[in-house]
Amino acid sequence: MRSNKLKPLVIGDITIEHPLALAPMAGVTDLPYRLLCKEQGAGMMCTEMVSAKGLYYGNRKSEPLMATDSKEIPVAIQIFGSDPEIMGQMAAKVNDGRFQMIDINMGCPVPKVVRNGEGSALMKNPKLVYELVSATVKAIKKPVTVKIRKGFDDDCLLYTSDAADEARS
């Protein structure tokens, strides 16, 4: 007889018993929504995307995006940016116990994000992908994941994922 039970997902030292993850969605995945999804069986939560530059410059809009509750563990914070130094510093800043992992956004197609060389624009620059992931991994001792899209051409996805994997080594 075949079992319908999903196997746990392991990311670094985190085991997600029910391997259904709530994707980060700007304007949607605030704390109340994440708690509702947790009640309904989501095994891992992720915040809305938070700007590394916003954190760096103390933008007051950033803090509410990072609200957490112990009921939603494990929870990841999703950060985005294009400056490796700032990304590393802000990864260290949010390494305060609220989050079990960091997800780097390299998939957002919103024009104002892409114009700043952030989000999905990063997929056109594997060297910068490597630098951003490397700076984040070096700054913390938690798992780092990367959200990417299909890409701009046939090779884009491979170059991006290869650069991210190499940076984590």
Regions found by a protein language model. Name each.
Residues 159-169:
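Single conserved hydrophobic/aromatic residue that forms the stacking wall/gate
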Residues 1-161:
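Flavin-dependent oxidoreductase catalytic cores
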